[in-house]
Amino acid sequence: MTMAKLTESMTNVLEGDSMDQDVESPVAIHQPKLPKQARDDLPRHISRDRTKRKIQRYVRKDGKCNVHHGNVRETYRYLTDIFTTLVDLKWRFNLLIFVMVYTVTWLFFGMIWWLIAYIRGDMDHIEDPSWTPCVTNLNGFVSAFLFSIETETTIGYGYRVITDKCPEGIILLLIQSVLGSIVNAFMVGCMFVKISQPKKRAETLVFSTHAVISMRDGKLCLMFRVGDLRNSHIVEASIRAKLIKSKQTSEGEFIPLNQSDINVGYYTGDDRLFLVSPLIISHEINQQSPFWEISKAQLPKEELEIVVILEGIVEATGMTCQARSSYITSEILWGYRFTPVLTMEDGFYEVDYNSFHETYETSTPSLSAKELAELANRAEVPLSWSVSSKLNQHAELETEEEEKNPEELTERNGDVANLENESKV
């Protein structure tokens, strides 16, 4: 019993020491963190269970770029192009600067008018009718400030007037008139350019919320839809698309957010649009396409983004307008097509924008375009996935053979008739 108690007490002491050591020890053992690329290459069975990571957008759905510039040291470059800097500011800051510039100039010249009157002694001879002041009826800073506003805005109430006995006042009047015209031209020009910017015109250029992948003319195609809500059209409209996807070169260089072109009809002229009604933009997935080896099962695993850019000239103003949108993998529907929105009414065509974003499911192979091409080459038949079309094609081939060799067909039919007669006998 004594040995058992001694052993138990020793065990408790050791456990207590180990617990105290765990609590009081300032050293924490952390699992080494691998680089991002190495973590992505880990097998699934040893990777941690975590929720599906959301793809970070490069361009948002409304067309704004999701990029913030940090640690910009050469901020003086913004001042060298002060006009563009003011135009790019938000409206609240633009209006604040507009009011502040005019207020500061009025106060500045009002202070100078008051100093001239004070130095000349006009303030001491306000009630003296024989004294000729620089500016009549200027009896303080408030009246000098009001005279500055009247001078710069050319209001001219006639109550305060500069006299010819004040040459310094005449020079100041010329300077304020010239500087006031420059301030008016600069600030009014900024406001006019900001109001007439074609950014708001892009609000009426809409893109479908989803892109689709389906068969078109026997080829796998990526498609999305664009439309213009206004009756005044976009002149010289053109569309282009970019694939944003990180890549690693054969030399091991990692290129984040690499941009590559997606052909939407550049060589055929289909990228130049007559955007009167909604159009479906199609990208044929061929060997030059970045989607050549992507199948339906592999598409959700890809970390990519498709940026579409629609450019054109605004018919009303003649200014260039650009609208942008993007699609990530979760917004690309495999095996779907867009619902038609154009119908013919009595004497005109009507567009139903309620169905602009709607899609419907269609029969589409889940294989990649590369696998489909390999199957087609192996079978030595055109890529087609309709049984009826195959039967029709076979019937057409037989008809062509009959038209080419009618004599052989007659002899073949005669031989068949003789065999039937012999069998009857």
Swiss-Prot record:
User: From what superkingdom does this record's organism come?
Assistant: Eukaryota
Q: What topology does it adopt in the membrane?
A: Multi-pass membrane protein
Main localization category: membrane
Where are residues bearing Phosphoserine located in the sequence?
S18, S25
Q: Which UniProt keywords apply?
A: Disease variant, Ion channel, Ion transport, Membrane, Phosphoprotein, Potassium, Potassium transport, Transmembrane, Transmembrane helix, Transport, Voltage-gated channel
Molecular function (GO) terms for this protein are: G-protein activated inward rectifier potassium channel activity; inward rectifier potassium channel activity; potassium channel activity; voltage-gated monoatomic ion channel activity involved in regulation of presynaptic membrane potential
Among its keywords, does the record have Ligase?
Answer: no
Q: Where are the transmembrane segments?
A: 92-116, 169-190
Q: Where is this motif: PDZ-binding?
A: 422-425
Query: What segment(s) does the record annotate as region Disordered?
Result: 392-425
Where, subcellularly, is it found? Membrane
Q: Name one GO cellular component term.
A: membrane
Give the location of motif Selectivity filter in residue numbers.
154-159
Which regions of this chain are Cytoplasmic-facing, per the record's topological domains?
Answer: 1-91, 191-425
Activation/inhibition comment:
Activated by phosphatidylinositol 4,5 biphosphate (PtdIns(4,5)P2).
Q: Which Pfam families match?
A: IRK, IRK_C
Extract one GO BP annotation from the record.
Answer: negative regulation of insulin secretion
Site (Role in the control of polyamine-mediated channel gating and in the blocking by intracellular magnesium): which residue positions? N184
Question: Which family would the database say this protein is a member of?
Answer: Belongs to the inward rectifier-type potassium channel (TC 1.A.2.1) family. KCNJ6 subfamily.
Which disease is given in the protein's UniProt record? Defects in Kcnj6 are the cause of the weaver (wv) phenotype. Homozygous animals suffer from severe ataxia that is obvious by about the second postnatal week. The cerebellum of these animals is drastically reduced in size due to depletion of the major cell type of cerebellum, the granule cell neuron. Heterozygous animals are not ataxic but have an intermediate number of surviving granule cells. Male homozygotes are sterile, because of complete failure of sperm production. Both hetero- and homozygous animals undergo sporadic tonic-clonic seizures.
Q: What does this protein do?
A: Inward rectifier potassium channels are characterized by a greater tendency to allow potassium to flow into the cell rather than out of it. Their voltage dependence is regulated by the concentration of extracellular potassium; as external potassium is raised, the voltage range of the channel opening shifts to more positive voltages. The inward rectification is mainly due to the blockage of outward current by internal magnesium. This potassium channel is controlled by G proteins. Forms a functional channel in association with KCNJ3/GIRK1.
Could you tell me what this protein is called?
G protein-activated inward rectifier potassium channel 2
